[in-house]
């Protein structure tokens, strides 16, 4: 399993979030999940990195960078780049 500090900001009703989580699990990529509907600070963070929009899924990496609505392949490539 690829282990890295990876957080996915989601909502319970987001189909894109479910798709990404399923794909990451299938690729054995570990992640933490934060539902922005239940965490005001998380919702504010997501808005701050998405031009004021609370767009999910938003993924935050260990280096502080983010991707919005990425594919599992994009997440995997970013993790490889961060790992150097």
From Swiss-Prot:
Keywords: Oxidoreductase
GO biological process assignments: cell redox homeostasis
Enzyme Commission numbers on file: 1.-.-.-
PROSITE patterns: GLUTAREDOXIN_2
Organism whose genome encodes this protein: Mycobacterium tuberculosis (strain ATCC 25618 / H37Rv)
Enzyme kind, highest EC tier: oxidoreductase
Alphabetized GO MF terms: electron transfer activity; oxidoreductase activity
Matching PANTHER family: GLUTAREDOXIN, GLUTAREDOXIN-LIKE PROTEIN NRDH
Pfam families: Glutaredoxin
Domain of life assignment: Bacteria
Name of the featured protein: Putative glutaredoxin Rv3198A
Domain Glutaredoxin residue range list: 1-84
